Amino acid sequence: SGGIRPSIIRASGVAEGGKTSCALAFARNFQATVDNSMAIYIKSEGRLSADMIARSGVDTSPDKWFVYKSNIFESVLQLMRDLITDNPTNCKYFFIIDSMDAMVPKKDMDRSFEDADKVAGGSVLSSNFLKKMALGLATRWHICFMISQVRSKVSVNMYEKTDPKLTNASGGNA
């Protein structure tokens, strides 16, 4: 099944490090080798372009490829659950989430930036995702390729009158 077994795979790396290209290569192989298969690209942050899709060789026919644009954690989770549980044709799915770090809980969408969950937010969402999806994906023979960014530079405005330990700057390896 595309060189990898049904499971959840996480690829982490720097921006422009080839994670999306790698995921698309696996998706192409999955489409070519698994009968009744479909690749679902969940675009929450990634820079997926028509050129990138063309270079990857992914089959973009409607019964083999779908792009879902959302960065709301709950809507992505619901889409995936619906596809794998209400699946009368027994289609095998290769999900690409690009990227997990761009996911936002619905409750944070209505909050101010200062009130939103910050510390290790991406790690908490990934953990919740794994708890809810790992067993269902693996036992029904689906694959999820989660892409994560490594943002190792955390910068703080030295002129701001706040405690530098309480930053809301992006970055870090939480």
Language model features with spans:
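Structural motif
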Residues: 9, 38-40, 93-95, 143-145
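A short alpha->loop->secondary-structure connector
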Residues: 33-34, 56-65, 111-119, 161-171
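A short beta-strand-to-loop transition that corresponds to the Sensor-1 phosphate-sensing loop
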Residues: 43-45, 99-100, 146-152
